[in-house]
Amino acid sequence: MATKQLLRRQIKRVINALDYDIIAAESHTISQAVRSLIASANSRRVACYMSMDKGEVTTGEIIKNLFQDGQEVFLPRCTHTSESKHFKLREDHHPHLIFHRMSSLKMVRDLKPQGPYQLKEPEPHIEESDILDVVLVPGVAFDIKTGARMGHGAGYYDDFFQRYKILHEGQKPLLVGLCLMEQVASPIPLEKHDYSMDCIVCGDGSIHWFQ
């Protein structure tokens, strides 16, 4: 656990210091690769994330492309079981993600910062996701040899993947990690609740698949 926390701090220090131009260039390359990947996978229902101001792949272009290509787009909201009334996997009132369907790019652009991290999130009344084909996943670091992912430590995405499998008889969407070149790390120590990616798309445009 200490090794994982140290690695997280080291990677965060690097990516938080990156120039915006570097992140923008890599994010554009990733968006083009993701567009091709989703088209070839014949996917229709895609979950993405609203990127933070720094330290991760930006998703504005990806979301715009998804709407242009006729995908159904879903974005996450941070909530907790006492509010959502969803079943509990851990302690009472623990935090988790809900993905909501966005009907247009304008709807996305009109989102306001809210929630514990002041991210642009959907309002609670918007339609929730059921079946998802693809989830585009953020992270602090990714291992392109094994598919391992290290998040920010709160467990939101691993919790969502576990909930999804319980609700859908063991099935899960295609999990696609979006990774700046500066986020590539190996090895990444995993705990029993950590989910690995099905593929990772990197800032140089490469796509790494895992069985």
From Swiss-Prot:
Kindly state which keywords UniProt assigns to this record, in alphabetical order. Answer: ATP-binding, Glycoprotein, Ligase, Mitochondrion, Nucleotide-binding
Effects seen without this gene: Abolishes methenyltetrahydrofolate synthase activity and leads to accumulation of folinic acid. Leads to a striking methionine deficiency when combined with ADE16 and ADE17, 2 isoenzymes involved in the purine synthesis.
Q: Can you cite an annotated GO cellular component?
A: mitochondrion
Enumerate the catalysed reactions. Answer: (6S)-5-formyl-5,6,7,8-tetrahydrofolate + ATP = (6R)-5,10-methenyltetrahydrofolate + ADP + phosphate
Residues that hold substrate according to the record: 56, 152-156
Compartment list = Mitochondrion
Q: Which domain of life is it from?
A: Eukaryota
Q: What is its EC number?
A: 6.3.3.2
Q: Does the keyword Nucleotide-binding apply?
A: yes
What's the PTM story here? N-glycosylated.
Q: Where does ATP bind?
A: 4-8, 151-158, 194
Q: Name one GO molecular function term.
A: 5-formyltetrahydrofolate cyclo-ligase activity
Q: Which InterPro entries match?
A: FTHF_cligase, FTHF_cligase-like_sf, NagB/RpiA_transferase-like
Q: Which GO terms describe its biological process?
A: folic acid-containing compound biosynthetic process; tetrahydrofolate interconversion
**What does this gene product do?**
Only enzyme known to utilize 5-formyltetrahydrofolate (folinic acid) as substrate. Contributes to tetrahydrofolate metabolism in an alternative way of folate biosynthesis. May regulate carbon flow through the folate-dependent one-carbon metabolic network that supplies carbon for the biosynthesis of purines, thymidine and amino acids.
Give the protein family.
Belongs to the 5-formyltetrahydrofolate cyclo-ligase family.
Which NCBIfam families does the protein's record reference?
A: MTHFS_bact (TIGR02727)
More info: Present with 468 molecules/cell in log phase SD medium.
Know the name of this protein?
A: 5-formyltetrahydrofolate cyclo-ligase
What gene codes for this chain? FAU1
